[in-house]
A protein has these predicted regions:
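Short, glycine/charge-rich beta-strand/loop segments that flank catalytic centers
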Residues: 48-62, 108, 135-139
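Segments that shape or occlude catalytic/ligand-binding pockets
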Residues: 10-55
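A contiguous, low-structure linker/loop signature
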Residues: 53-105
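Short, well-ordered loop/turn elements at secondary-structure boundaries
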Residues: 42, 62, 126-127
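N-terminal low-complexity, intrinsically disordered patches enriched in charged
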Residues: 25, 82, 296-297
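Acidic/polar N-terminal loop/beta-strand segments that form early-domain functional surfaces
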Residues: 1-2, 43-53, 71, 134
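Active-site loop segments of alpha/beta catalytic cores
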Residues: 1-20, 69, 78, 96-308
Length: 308
């Protein structure tokens, strides 16, 4: 659901189409507004994005691009055509007062919604696309914990400092709920789906003990979903979650997620037919094509078989 600038250019050149009106970046991982490509390919979904704040507006990617710090305190460095997030600005976290002293972003800055309602109304009234509210930040509370604290510290805190980690998770969730609130104020009547994002798995299984998800993370996901549903009852909740996450799926359903994206079909427990058989009555699976082998190395017949 997002393309880096370099990949976008390769696809545009390959298909040979020209753009007439394009915003360079949407402020998320330095990605382009690629609706012209979606139009060309005839896809049936369009994503709506919160706007970047002034300090997070960037120009075309090029040799002169320098690392920068975003409003979360995260450092963006250009690596092989995309910006890698680093810096771990809360790696020093030791006590609850550190959480409160941190300069958290203000979700309600006016520039985040400039022209957003008008764009949503235009797509809703004059197209037949399914409209999706793109995740308003890089990810939800677990994803952002890993960015702000660092992977190692995050995982250690779930075991050794559960009380402090839960205080951090609560604060993180509250800030993110503000982003969803301001987003839905503008696009809620027009979208059919809104996205959340948490990578809970590795290629081999869960990233952490699934019991921790149920004991701590579940209720925060549930709380966010309840707030979204209260403001926009018709909206379906899509979770972007990479990895071999089958063991999480019953709890994800219980938390209120309606759609899971992607399905990494080559990983343990992620066979699309088995997932549909076991969970299909409660969950929609989106994106089940093997992009690692079939799309890169398969022939046309392989791809057709995979899609079916």
């Amino acid at each position: 659901n997002h393309l880096t600038e370099n990949l976008y250019k390769l696809l545009k050149d390959y298909f040979g189409f020209k753009e007439t009106d394009r915003r360079t970046l949407v402020g998320f991982y330095s990605t382009p507004d690629y609706n012209p490509l979606l139009d060309y390919l005839g896809t049936d979904m369009r994503f709506l994005h919160l706007r970047p704040v002034d300090s997070f507006i960037m120009n075309e990617i090029g040799p002169s691009f320098q690392p920068f710090i975003d409003e979360w305190g995260l450092k963006h460095e250009l690596l092989s055509g995309y910006y890698n997030l680093g810096g771990e600005p809360l790696a020093h976290l030791e006590r609850q007062s550190d959480i409160e002293k941190y300069p958290w972003p203000d979700p309600y800055k006016a520039e985040r919604i400039t022209g957003l309602r008008e764009e949503a109304e235009q797509l809703y009234n004059f197209t037949e696309y399914s409209l999706v509210g793109h995740r308003p930040v890089y990810g939800n509370a677990w994803e952002m914990s890993r960015f702000l604290l660092g992977m190692e510290k995050t995982l250690l805190m779930t075991v050794k400092e559960k009380i402090l980690f839960e205080a951090f998770f609560d604060k993180m969730s509250n800030v993110l709920d503000g982003f969803y609130d301001v987003f839905l104020n503008e696009v809620g009547p027009f979208i059919q789906i809104i996205e959340m994002a948490e990578d809970l798995g590795t290629n081999n299984g869960p990233m952490f003990n699934p019991k921790f998800y149920k004991e701590v993370m579940w209720r925060y996901h549930r709380r966010t979903i309840e707030k979204i549903k209260k403001k926009a009852p018709h909206v379906k909740i899509m979770l972007h979650c990479d990895g071999a996450i089958r063991r999480f799926i019953p709890d994800l359903i219980d938390a209120g997620f309606d759609i899971l994206n992607p399905v990494e079909s080559d990983l343990i427990g992620m066979d699309p037919a088995e997932l549909k058989r076991d969970f299909g009555k409660d969950l929609v699976f989106m994106g089940g094509v093997d992009v690692k082998k079939i799309l890169t190395k398969g022939n046309r017949r392989d791809i057709q078989r995979e899609i079916r």
